[in-house]
């Protein structure tokens, strides 16, 4: 068990709260108590770090803002106190087109929903209920570019998101690993959703960088998550905690599991 907590990092969606939902009151009180004790509190999310993410404390009526944010599954880091940031490179338009061309037979055959994050690009392929729900929750438009690779790839982005069934997501992952041999990684962020981005980034590496910037021993960090993209975060921290209803593989590697989901 961890004896001294200097840093807490927590996944957002389905860990701290349901997607785009308020925090439970018990979580608010716990975060406030940790803040009073000068614990550095941060978010670890797959999302791009925007002003909305930077003001999550206000949105959740905490009375303070988070000390740091690990975004884009470790591809972005924001340290509020040091006013320091790190941002990964974007996929080029040429790379985007090559990736979609390679995966298009699978996308078309299985009606895989595709969208991206970065550069405020809202182009999508194969609109389904999951994309419609995401659009409503985050108040962003969907621009249908199904089958139009050139039209879809208007400008560079950080990552692709593919939404489909588990069998097809595994097929995509196998094809990407076999063809690109480590240039890109695929990460499950939610059952039925995988993301494709450059390799070499993870939430765990993001936590390492934050601690390096602030000269904090990783042994004094605690992390919370629920899915595959949180695995590195839980393993890197001094004490990794998985949600009770989390991914079985994530639960297996955690130091502890919550009593409640």
Labelled PLM ranges:
Residues 2-7, 23-24, 195-261:
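Mg2+-dependent phosphoryl-transfer enzymes with acidic/Ser/Thr/Gly-rich catalytic loops
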Residues 6-11, 42-43:
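Short, hydrophobic/glycine-enriched beta-strand segments
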Residues 25-130:
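Active-site phosphate-binding/coordination module
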Residues 38-42, 66-67, 159, 219-221, ...:
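Short active-site oxyanion
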Residues 62-65, 73, 180-182, 236-237, ...:
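Short, structured coil segments at secondary-structure junctions
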Residues 102-224:
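Conserved acidic, metal-coordinating active-site core of Asp-based
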């Amino acid at each position: 068990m961890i004896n001294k907590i200097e840093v807490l990092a927590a996944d957002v969606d389905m860990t701290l709260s349901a997607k785009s939902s308020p925090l439970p009151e018990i979580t608010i009180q716990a975060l406030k108590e940790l803040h009073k004790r000068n614990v550095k509190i941060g978010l670890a999310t797959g999302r791009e770090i925007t002003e909305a993410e930077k003001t999550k404390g206000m949105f959740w009526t905490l009375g303070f803002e988070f000390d740091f944010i690990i975004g884009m599954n470790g591809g972005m880091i924001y340290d509020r106190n040091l006013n320091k940031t790190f941002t990964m490179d974007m996929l080029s338009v040429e790379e985007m087109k090559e990736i979609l061309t390679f995966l298009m037979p699978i996308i078309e055959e299985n009606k895989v929903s595709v969208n991206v994050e970065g550069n405020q690009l809202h182009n999508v392929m194969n609109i389904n209920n999951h994309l419609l729900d995401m659009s409503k929750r985050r108040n962003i438009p969907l621009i249908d570019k199904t089958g139009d690779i050139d039209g879809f790839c208007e400008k560079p982005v950080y990552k692709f998101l593919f939404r489909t069934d588990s069998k097809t997501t595994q097929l995509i992952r196998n094809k990407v690993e076999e063809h690109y041999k480590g240039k890109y990684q695929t990460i499950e962020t939610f059952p039925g959703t995988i993301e494709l981005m450059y390799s070499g980034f993870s939430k765990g590496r993001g936590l390492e960088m934050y601690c390096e910037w602030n000269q904090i021993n990783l042994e004094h960090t605690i992390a919370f998550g629920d899915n595959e993209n949180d695995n590195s975060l839980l393993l890197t921290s001094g004490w990794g905690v998985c949600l009770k209803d989390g991914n079985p593989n994530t639960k297996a590697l955690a130091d502890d599991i919550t009593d409640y989901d």
